[in-house]
Amino acid sequence: MDYKITGYEPAQLFHFFEEVSAIPRGSGNEKGISDFLVAFAKERGLDVYQDEVYNVIIRKPASAGAENAPTVMLQGHIDMVCDKLGSVEHDFTTDGIDLVVKDGVLTANGTTLGADNGIAVALMLTVLDDDSIAHPALECVFTTDEETGLVGAETLDKSQISARTMINLDSEEEGVATVSCAGGVVVTYTCPIAREHKTGSTLTLDISGLLGGHSGSDINLERGNGNLIMARIIDRLMVAGEPAIVSFNGGTKDNAINRECKAVLVYADHAAAEAAAEIARGIIADVTAELEVFDPGFTCTVEIADDAEVEAMDQKSALALIRALRLAPNGVIRRNVATDGSVEVSSNIGVVATSDDEVKIMLSPRSSITSLQNEFKDRLQTLADVLGFDAKFEFEYPGWSYAEHSPVRDVFVESYRELFGSELRIESIHAGLECGLFAEALHGLDAIAVGPTLSDVHTPDESMELASAERFYELLIDVLKRLAA
């Protein structure tokens, strides 16, 4: 193929990235890239394992002289988030990524780039392909469906892995190593609703412009949540009068801070709707002032339409919905005040959806401490019981605890200092990583998560600094050489 990325070393790293990018590999569509990896291994005479969900493990013997060094696992995921600009024609099920190189930065042409986590795949392929590198025995683990709930890592038969040293390649900032993460679970509240025929004037409230963000790593930034703001407005309107809720919909992902929410209410006549609109505008002004620093793009439009005939929730159903949203925990719940104030427990109300006969609320609670996670789940169940909602807990994944003693962390710190003359920053993140699933299954696992600088992942603005990838490869090879000694 004709390669677009030139002038960076090793060239093979960037060639592999381009080859991987040419293969459609959205979550749930990973057979093609998985089969590509199997063929890659067989062409080089490497031992390869592929399971029924298309996870792949490629094993490479130690380089000469490193046969007695402990085996090392390199790990990343092969799926990517698929998102694009509305103006772009791109079919993620059949089309590869159209790469764009400009001023040392790699992006895609109006779509997600997939460097999260395609760069990990390219890094491992480069190491596996180069017989001049000094390294211990390697187990390169390529997992599926990470972006939709760490599914591949959870499903993988961990008995296939002998390594007890793990280098996860799914971190997104050069010069930073992640050494622990939070666990989490998806909680879905559902409640049946009754509807009744109403005539009058509708009041439509439409929230937009919020920054949103990741419900783990961005939960401490005090950004607005459209679902909560909408519930606040409607709660006040319920105190002032008797609106009936026709619909309330906000968010599409439990693990994203909600940016947009739209609700439709119905009043007996135009005068009642206009009076409610004035109250709503006052609350909107308050919220705008409250978010001026943290989320300045917030807007909420208010529109009235007369002569409406709708099927609205009855008062009992409407009260159940608003009470649930006003009482369900959201945001930072607990911090570690003994150390750096990092978030230990949080919750995010990511999705609210009303249908003809049901309301659904999806929450994403997280904790870096298992006992606190379990206690918080109990609280959420109690709240559901009190409010009359059914609660379902699913897609749970474990946290990854900080290790006081970590040889692989020490090696990375020493290597980074000697190569670049500065200190590697060590951090914990309040988000889920595949490391947690591997650490839970592989007793005594010594793990670290690292990677080059990526920006705006999961969006059409996603980018990768090519020089950062170049430097990171240098670091990875040096670490493997040290681990082989």
Model-derived segments and spans:
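Acidic/His- and Gly-rich active-site-bordering loop/insert found
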Residues: 3-105
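Zn-dependent metallopeptidase/amidohydrolase metal-coordination segment
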Residues: 5, 10-13, 337, 344-360, ...
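A short beta-alpha structural unit
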Residues: 18-22, 253, 299-312, 348-352, ...
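Active-site metal-coordination/substrate-binding segment of hydrolases
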Residues: 66-164, 190, 199-202, 315-318, ...
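Fold-level recognition of mixed alpha/beta catalytic cores in primary-metabolism enzymes, strongest
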Residues: 136-226, 234, 238
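His/Asp/Glu-rich mid-to-C-terminal helical/loop segments that flank catalytic regions of hydrolases
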Residues: 159, 223-240, 270-273, 317-326, ...
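Acidic-enriched catalytic cores of C-N bond-cleaving enzymes acting on peptides and small amides
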Residues: 196-200, 219-249, 268-346, 380
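Active-site-adjacent substrate-binding region
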Residues: 223-248, 402-445
